[in-house]
Amino acid sequence: MEKSFDYDVIIIGTGPGGEGAAMNLAKRQKKVAIIERYHQVGGGCTHWGTIPSKALRQSVSRLIEYNSNPLFNQNEQVKQLTFQDILSHASAVIQKQVSLRSGFYNRNRVEHIQGQASFIDAHTISISHPDGSVEKISAKQIMIATGSRPYRPDDIDFDHPRVYDSDSILSLKHAPQHVIIYGAGVIGSEYASIFRGLGVKVDLINTRERLLSFLDTEMSDSLSYHLWNSGVVIRHGEEIERVESSEDAVIVHLKSGKKMRADCLLFANGRTGNTADLNLAAAGLKADGRGQLKVNDCYQTEVDNIFAVGDVIGYPSLASAAFDQGRIAASAMVDSSSKAKLIVDIPTGIYTIPEISSVGKTEQELTEAKIPYEVGRAQFKHLARAQISNNLVGSLKILFHRETKEILGIHCFGENAAEIIHIGQAIMQQTNGGNTIEYFVETTFNYPTMAEAFRVAALNGLNRLF
């Protein structure tokens, strides 16, 4: 006789991965409970990561646009905003997202339970509620979608009011004139753009020799130049030795012997999977040193009935990918396998100012693989739409095979790059000869549009062939 359970599936975490799984399972008529320890749904993506940082960036971008446009700024009186000023917009967006996502669970009859989840065994979860009560629920299958949190080294005092990570920075109570950002990855680079756009002095400490070294070199160089040109001081190849703090300042001592003083420190160097409080051992699981879980192609852990998706399994650690992982894993939970797979070329969007987006191979990767490629480029400053909107900084680069004309990679730098990239991505996904740069020459684009950059870049690249 088959054992009875309270639910078909319990999902731990309401971020993109948990949501994607819950919606798919609900559509398949499964009884689903989703557990969230925070008092609102949405996970780190909605409350501390993707949504608030992009909302902050949007406000700063519009501020920069206003101050740099003579049509609006005829008296040369610079409009100034503080970090607290723009937080109100981010908070409003967060609440809209919470309302929207709460509606998803209600309409699809997914039971939302607030509390801290931990394993009792591979089928049973203990939930500690905010009021101190504890309940136990069980399910045939369980999904871990708990996301990640900022890495906090033990020797840095994050309780100090002038030391922040990428979560706590959203609770900034003062108006810093100078900020040190340690870690020049995606998060650090985005916040460097935000603070500098507000007129705050920024020291960006990079532990590597290049900014965002996974990007195409031209994109990385473009970002470095524009951050430098805006006044951000970038220090490459540096590591923190210790942090000295006072009531209203921090002094960062580097292993190279340098030291810097600022109003506050934003530590943005690495993230850790949220598994420490789950009592994984009771379920027969063990996380690695970064708090992450290993899974197979169907997102199944080494315990057959337990699956994991999103940041808690590591790469690619993108909200977009997490949602798809949840959806794919849900299919595997129901059908024992899933025909759908995460696409190979996942687009990357980095919301610096200007923003960056890419899909496919970089020039470095193609050169190393000895693939005969050609390059097509379009400069935004030559596009009528860019001239109209006064967003002249940026470019689009298409990498394609010289012989087959197959598109191998697309890299974009500039306003709306993360939107523009999807036009190229759609063509790259075509099969049976549909993936060709000639598509952009043969189709008709609306005029004037930023999308026209694809036609310009395609013509530029094809004209290089001989």
UniProtKB/Swiss-Prot annotation:
<keyword id="KW-0521">NADP</keyword>
<feature type="binding site">
    <location>
        <begin position="36"/>
        <end position="45"/>
    </location>
    <ligand>
        <name>FAD</name>
    </ligand>
</feature>
<dbReference type="InterPro" id="IPR050151">
    <property type="entry name" value="Class-I_Pyr_Nuc-Dis_Oxidored"/>
</dbReference>
<comment type="similarity">
    <text>Belongs to the class-I pyridine nucleotide-disulfide oxidoreductase family.</text>
</comment>
<dbReference type="Pfam" id="PF07992">
    <property type="entry name" value="Pyr_redox_2"/>
</dbReference>
<keyword id="KW-0963">Cytoplasm</keyword>
<dbReference type="InterPro" id="IPR001100">
    <property type="entry name" value="Pyr_nuc-diS_OxRdtase"/>
</dbReference>
<keyword id="KW-0285">Flavoprotein</keyword>
<keyword id="KW-0560">Oxidoreductase</keyword>
<dbReference type="GO" id="GO:0005829">
    <property type="term" value="C:cytosol"/>
</dbReference>
<dbReference type="GO" id="GO:0004148">
    <property type="term" value="F:dihydrolipoyl dehydrogenase (NADH) activity"/>
</dbReference>
<keyword id="KW-0274">FAD</keyword>
<dbReference type="GO" id="GO:0050660">
    <property type="term" value="F:flavin adenine dinucleotide binding"/>
</dbReference>
<comment type="function">
    <text>Conversion of NADPH, generated by peripheral catabolic pathways, to NADH, which can enter the respiratory chain for energy generation.</text>
</comment>
<dbReference type="InterPro" id="IPR004099">
    <property type="entry name" value="Pyr_nucl-diS_OxRdtase_dimer"/>
</dbReference>
<keyword id="KW-0520">NAD</keyword>
<dbReference type="GO" id="GO:0006739">
    <property type="term" value="P:NADP metabolic process"/>
</dbReference>
<dbReference type="Pfam" id="PF02852">
    <property type="entry name" value="Pyr_redox_dim"/>
</dbReference>
<protein>
    <recommendedName>
        <fullName>Soluble pyridine nucleotide transhydrogenase</fullName>
        <ecNumber>1.6.1.1</ecNumber>
    </recommendedName>
</protein>
<dbReference type="InterPro" id="IPR016156">
    <property type="entry name" value="FAD/NAD-linked_Rdtase_dimer_sf"/>
</dbReference>
<dbReference type="InterPro" id="IPR022962">
    <property type="entry name" value="STH_gammaproteobact"/>
</dbReference>
<dbReference type="GO" id="GO:0006103">
    <property type="term" value="P:2-oxoglutarate metabolic process"/>
</dbReference>
<dbReference type="InterPro" id="IPR023753">
    <property type="entry name" value="FAD/NAD-binding_dom"/>
</dbReference>
<dbReference type="GO" id="GO:0003957">
    <property type="term" value="F:NAD(P)+ transhydrogenase (Si-specific) activity"/>
</dbReference>
<dbReference type="InterPro" id="IPR036188">
    <property type="entry name" value="FAD/NAD-bd_sf"/>
</dbReference>
